[in-house]
From Swiss-Prot:
GO cellular component terms attached to this protein's record: cytoplasm; nucleus
Gene: TMA10
Note: Present with 504 molecules/cell in log phase SD medium.
Name of this chain's protein: Translation machinery-associated protein 10
Protein family (similarity comment): Belongs to the STF2 family.
Length: 86
């Protein structure tokens, strides 16, 4: 009787080495450092579009005016009805 703990009690299953030994804690192992602004400041995918718009090579795409809501249209119609005289 040299052992006091039973062999039937097992510890929790450990995480795979892939997740425990690569990168920082709580990060996926294939995480890109600084969100893509890596060595040489090469930027994130899609940043080149803003550069092309600024240089004038392509036109701006998001130049639509904001649509009014239905409540604004309804208010205008009600005010027109109230101002209508027979």
């Amino acid at each position: 009787m040299t052992r006091t703990s039973k062999w039937t009690v097992h510890e929790a299953k450990s995480n795979p080495k892939y997740f425990t030994h690569n990168g920082n804690f709580g990060e996926s192992p294939n995480h890109v450092k600084r969100g893509g602004y890596g060595k040489g400041n090469w930027g994130k995918p899609g940043d080149e579009i803003n550069d092309l718009i600024d240089s004038g090579e392509i036109k701006t795409v998001f130049n639509k005016t904001r649509r009014g809501s239905n409540s604004q249209n309804n208010e205008r119609r009600l005010s027109d009805l109230q101002q209508y005289h027979i």
